[in-house]
């Protein structure tokens, strides 16, 4: 199946909720993709096609998934391409020694962490999450990978809220599978 066909079928699965979680917000619900095994497989297939088209035979060592929705598909994608999966979590959720970085949220700051031995110097990394909005959390994850001397090749998202220009904050190119709100 072509990437374009996969995108069309996956886009049809999305639901929108007006005024959620607050008035004036249109919430893009990706969960129906994960509730249907065929759609979930199509999501992984679409990302695999993109990675193959973009990087050819270049080895991707690590998929980094952001807390929490990057955990929905990050491990499955990592397994599908023969890469390791490494979680980036909110502060205090990972055991052992960690490296941390702050990022700005709508109403204050938050902190992400990664285990300090999770990525080896020189490893190639793709960072994944469900949606890129302001780009703060994704940029923070990229900073953590860089602190561990990994090479961020790309950021991959299911959706993007283009009007927030989050990709401008990222340290590597961004790929969005489905078009989101303009």
UniProtKB/Swiss-Prot annotation:
It holds the Pfam family Pribosyltran. GO terms for molecular function: adenine binding; adenine phosphoribosyltransferase activity; AMP binding; metal ion binding. GO terms for biological process: adenine salvage; AMP salvage; purine ribonucleoside salvage. AMP binds at residues 133-137. It catalyses: AMP + diphosphate = 5-phospho-alpha-D-ribose 1-diphosphate + adenine. The keyword Transport does not apply. It is found in: Cytoplasm; Nucleus. Keywords: Cytoplasm, Glycosyltransferase, Magnesium, Metal-binding, Nucleus, Purine salvage, Transferase. Belongs to the purine/pyrimidine phosphoribosyltransferase family. NCBIfam families: apt, PRK02304.1-3, PRK02304.1-5. Homodimer. HAMAP family: Aden_phosphoribosyltr. Catalyzes a salvage reaction resulting in the formation of AMP, that is energically less costly than de novo synthesis. This is Adenine phosphoribosyltransferase. It comes from Yarrowia lipolytica (strain CLIB 122 / E 150). The gene is APT1.
